[in-house]
Amino acid sequence: MDLFLRLGNVLTEVVTSIFGVTLSEQVLLWNSPKKREYGDFSTAISFLIAKEVRLSLHEVACSIADGLRSFKDLFKNVSVASGGFINVFLTSDTWSEFLAAVSDDAGGYGFSDIGHAVPLNLEFVSANPTGPLHLGHIRGAVLFDIFAELLDKFGFSLTREYYINDAGKQIDLLVYSVFVRFCEQLRKKESDNFPSNCYAGDYIRDIASYLISTFPDSVKDTTELKSFSDTFREVILSLTMDMIKSDLAKLGISYDCYVREKELHEGNYIEKVIAVLDEKGYLDEEELPSPKGKSGDWVERRQKVFLSTKFGDDTNRALQKVDGSWTYFASDVAYHYHKLERGFNHMIVGLGADHAGYVKRLSGVVEALSGGDARIDIKLYNLVNLFRNGKPVKLSKRNGDLITLDDVLESGITVSEIRFAMLTKSSEIVLDFDLDKFVRASYDNPLFYVQYAHARCSSLLRKRGPSAKCDAAMLVEKQELDLMVTLAKLPSLLKVIVVSGEVHKLTFYLHEVAERFHALWNAGMIENKFRFIIEDEPELTNARLILVKAVKNTLASVLKVMKIEPAERM
């Protein structure tokens, strides 16, 4: 039951009937008032309407309040504050209906079909296949996997996609790194001067050993880099992608589709999209300024460019190098043309914050290719700083100090704790991941705090289950009313998250629900009147147990969309 939507529909009906004004985004028209004594909910709609109809704020607020008072089955009290806000208290029947609905909904509270099976492509992680994932990748993987779960729940026809960048210089460097270790192992002696620009993790040694033991007949013919690359490049790529897929599987993440950059090259997609952009008038040749850090030896030459400045970018972007080869950006353009060709007019891409410069250029590409009929939402996420024993652990993908998912799991952290931790801050903010905090069974551990609330609910319901009938009129304590209002926020909050992608708000909401529940539990430890089960007050006990069941279902609904199993006992 979406209580905010119901209130929004009523408010829309009242405003339209009185002023002839049509409202949008009904779920956002109601909020919690600053002080609980003002009401269950509050709206500032009078401020918007007064400007449009050119009447005084007080006059508009009073007219709307009178209209709301006609819905006697919904509102117990409607008042106008001096500032023009309209505050309402709901009837006990409304709250009874709400609690009954949520307590009966064991798996789907908060979700609705707003996607209507619209095709949507969500591309995320897409890390270069040069080794196992680091924590920055893991943060993006978890964020967008949970976002994908939400999009599924809200009825979108979602395709989870991974783009394999397997045609660039990083793969050449990966192959060379393995080749160096391969030659060392054949000589049975490691060099003290391993190239500093190479990938130096232990997994490089493991790949080299695998090649020698698995393909003994090919070893003697691959002691030169070219022959080695021709023979083993695809094998090495397969092995590193298996590492990535293994890490993702441990996190509970899978994909519907993998697209290889190499296949786009082989299918001449770059040439195809260049022709399309040229025909549409979005190509030119011009001399571009030197890249950052290369001004000393930079020689200006004319290059084929995409006119991204037409779409708000600060410079046009090179598609072809002076030697005739295509730029990395040209592959990106071809890839998004490939998405459009597959019928995706709505795309979401998750990128690291270091790719912020891609937002305008990729948005421009999609607009240029689709004529404005398709849209792309590029959502950025920041780095992760890992702490052990209060000391930061540096992350690096190219040296032996690489911190992998297995390293974190071996420290005692569970996958559920990792998934929760990745959402404890906005994705735009650098995340400090404190391993010590998440292994402690205490309120300092944010997942423990939430799971303990769910386990307490389960414990109460094992002792006594509520009857079917709920009388919310029995729930009059401030802590109870605060908790009910918080539960009612979930459906509208989830809709906001589906639009914005701000999935960290899930953990913030879980903490708020748990905090209000623990407050009520702790009050019962001090005063008997706050206890959930009071033997000589069966009606109050039943109402409180229905509230407990609603809390349990709400916590479970959000935890499950995060792929975290709610704890029944702790």
UniProtKB/Swiss-Prot annotation:
EC top class, as a word: ligase
Subcellular location: Cytoplasm
Keywords of the record: Aminoacyl-tRNA synthetase, ATP-binding, Cytoplasm, Ligase, Nucleotide-binding, Protein biosynthesis
PROSITE patterns (alphabetical): AA_TRNA_LIGASE_I (PS00178)
Molecular function in Gene Ontology: arginine-tRNA ligase activity; ATP binding
EC numbers on record: 6.1.1.19
Reactions mediated catalytically: tRNA(Arg) + L-arginine + ATP = L-arginyl-tRNA(Arg) + AMP + diphosphate
Highest taxon in the source lineage: Bacteria
Biological process annotations from GO: arginyl-tRNA aminoacylation
Motif 'HIGH' region, chain ranges: 127-137
InterPro entries, A to Z: aa-tRNA-synth_I_CS, Arg-tRNA-ligase, Arg-tRNA-synth_N, Arg-tRNA-synth_N_sf, ArgRS_core, DALR_anticod-bd, Rossmann-like_a/b/a_fold, tRNAsynth_Ia_anticodon-bd
GO (cellular component) term, any one: cytoplasm
Family membership: Belongs to the class-I aminoacyl-tRNA synthetase family.
Subunit structure: Monomer.
NCBIfam families recorded: argS
Protein's name in the database: Arginine--tRNA ligase
Organism: Neorickettsia sennetsu (strain ATCC VR-367 / Miyayama) (Ehrlichia sennetsu)
